[in-house]
Each structure stands twice: as structure tokens, then as C-alpha cells.
Amino acid sequence: MFGRGPSKKSDNTKFYEILGVPKSASPEDLKKAYKKAAIKNHPDKGGDPEKFKELAQAYEVLSDPEKREIYDQYGEDALKEGMGGGGGGHDPFDIFSSFFGGGPFGGNTSRQRRQRRGEDVVHPLKVSLEDVYLGTMKKLSLSRNALCSKCNGKGSKSGASLKCGGCQGSGMKVSIRQLGPGMIQQMQHACNECKGTGETINDRDRCPQCKGDKVIPEKKVLEVNVEKGMQHSQKITFEGQADEAPDTVTGDIVFVLQQKEHPKFKRKGEDLFVEHTLSLTEALCGFQFVLTHLDGRSLLIKSNPGEVVKPDSYKAISDEGMPIYQRPFMKGKLYIHFTVEFPDSLSPDQTKALEAVLPKPSTAQLSDMEIDECEETTLHDVNIEDEMRRKAQAQREAYDDDDEDDDHPGGAQRVQCAQQ
């Protein structure tokens, strides 16, 4: 991140005044002043939360030699421009705890009551349409980090740890470079000495089981209950089963259902759709067929006597759709979409037989004179989707050609003669 030192030096005394020390104060003087004022103004003892925050912000800047140098030279504005907050990016309770650990008041501090929450772990879970129709149980084996049982997540045999000297317990380091007059570059990164934990453990005191890492890998088997009627993208949550870490509220493991396509049935919410093709005879004279449902039942589907099924029509069967989630005895509808298959041609005898039983044409027969006055046409078969696709492609190509002509008006580019 880049920042430009202000041309007019801003206030560089405020942080010293907050701590009540002179600008020449030593690091030890800063520590003493902060500890005394922080205990007095701690919110758990009825102190002013804003004052407590200001003390932490001031001490965080002045206790860091590099930040203090920038503050003394350019003032608070330089830190704001370079770091986005005047050096107050850390929780004031973290800074306070680095002095007193669990707190000087014999109880939990406000910081301890607000433990950091670990990240949730999200896994996609593929399920079939049969799985969410019938319901199923899936056992899944997962790896996660668990607190070391030998040291209770302390990382050491004694349970003690030391504040990292490289980052003063903050877990972060700031690198600062001078790029030019009034230009500085500041970058914040995890401390490489403590890996961002703010603590170090004596090599001789390291836990023999976790080697000081505080956590160990473990295998965990979860039984995931996929209930009837669950939807695509619905979540199944196992609270507190994600990676464990010290002083952290464990996150959740979340499974997100990914419903696979079914070769026969299509699902839309609580309803199911299926395609069925009838011959022209079946559409006109009646039909019956067997449909195997998702649970293996055989459904007899048949038309009513004298019923004619039109092309592209739908029929519905109540209570044969999807079970409704958490109301498994209620179901949506099963819709059947009918397509009618017509013969490619008819013989003269077939045509006469059909004319004898089918309704007469709605349009009157044309006379020979009327036919003679008309222009004769020829019909040919066409795949309308392919036809439209070809037309769209031709239009795109023509549009591209127009763009090329606009780039080179008048056809080929002319070479300009140099003036004599």
C-alpha cells in the first residue's frame, strides 16, 4: 500500500498526550504509562471504552519503532494514509491481554468473552433425484484439525508460552520502505517467527504429540441425513465440527446439496415432469402405458374413453410429485407432457378411410377456375432450429464484414505520397 507524506505536517503530539508522556519517553516509560492508564480505563472496571481504545491505539504506534518514527516525522495523517486507520488496526483487548494474559481483575475480560470464530468448511454433496424423493443417509469421512489432547491445545508440556519478540505478540509485522521524497510504502504481513500466532514455545517445552502446533489431524465420520423433499443447493449444517484452534469458537461443516440430472424425470420445485410420445392412433383412439416411478412403483397411465390427446398437451396426476420438505406425506403433482408422432405419408386408400370418419375440412373446396388463377408452390421439409441458426450466423458474418469496411473506408488503404 502506498502513502504520500503530507506537505503540511499534521499533529504528532496527540498520542504522547493520551499516554501522558513526553516525546522523549523511553519504551519502558511507554509501557508503564499504558499499563497504569489501561487498568484505570478498562471497560470491565467501569472505564470509558473510547478512552481505552485511544490508549491502545497510541501505545500500538509509539511502541513500534518504525511507526513511531513515521508518526514523529509526518504525524498521524501519514499513518492513516499508509495503513488505513492510524495504526489502530488491532483489538485494544488484544494489546491489553499481551500485558496481563487472562486479565488483572480475576475474571474473564471483554476480549475473552468475544472469542474469534473459526471458518466454516463447505463441501458439495451430490445426490440423485431418488435420494431426495425417498430420503437417504450418507456416511462421509473427513479430515480436520483437533486440539491436541495431550497438551489441551497449549502446544507445550508446561502449558506456558512466551510473547513473540519479533512482533511483540501482535502476530503481524510491518515493513516500511522510503520510495522517494514524501513517499513511503508500508506492508503488513504475518510474523514469520511465530507464524502469526503472537507466541513462541521453548523447544525443550514443546508437546511431544503436536510438536508445538497445538492441533493434530484427525479423521471424522459424519452421518448426513438427506431428508425427503430437500432442494438443490439446500444446506445441511454440522455445528462446531470444523477445524479446532486454541481460543477459537469452532466453525461449522456445511454440506450443500447438488442434485444430479435424471434421465427420465425433471424436477421443478415440488412437481415432477416426464415426457411421453404417442402415436397418432393412440392420440385419437386411446392409450395406456406403465410408468416406473422413482420409488420403483409401477403406475398405469391410460386415457379416458373417447378422449383425444392433442400434440404438446399436458396431463397431471395429483400427489405423485416430490414429497414436500418436512411434510413428507404431502406431495406435488406429476405432469406428463405428450408429443404426438404423425406418419410421414398416407396411401390414397388410407386417406379416403380417414376422410370418411374424420370431420369435414373447415375450408370449402376450390373450383378449377380458382385454382387456375393461383400460383402453384412447393412445400419442402425444414428443421426450423437449424434454419434459424444458419440465418443468425449469416447475419453475424455480414456484421463483421461491415466493421472491416468501416476500418478501411474506400476499400484498400491508400499509400500517401510524401510531399516534395
Curated annotation (Swiss-Prot):
CXXCXGXG motif repeats: 148-155, 164-171, 191-198, 207-214
CR-type zinc finger segments: 135-219
InterPro entries in alphabetical order: DnaJ (IPR012724), DnaJ_C (IPR002939), DnaJ_domain (IPR001623), DnaJ_domain_CS (IPR018253), DNJA1/2-like (IPR044713), HSP40/DnaJ_pept-bd (IPR008971), HSP_DnaJ_Cys-rich_dom (IPR001305), HSP_DnaJ_Cys-rich_dom_sf (IPR036410)
Gene Ontology biological-process annotations: photoperiodism, flowering; positive regulation of flower development; protein folding; regulation of ATP-dependent activity; response to heat; response to salt stress
Positions with a binding annotation for Zn(2+) 1: C148, C151, C207, C210
Compositional bias of kind Basic and acidic residues: 377-390
Residues engaged in binding Zn(2+) 2: C164, C167, C191, C194
Keyword Zinc-finger: yes
Subcellular location: Membrane
Subunit annotation: Homodimer.
Family: Belongs to the DnaJ family. A/I subfamily.
Protein name, as recorded: Chaperone protein dnaJ 3
The organism of origin for this protein: Arabidopsis thaliana (Mouse-ear cress)
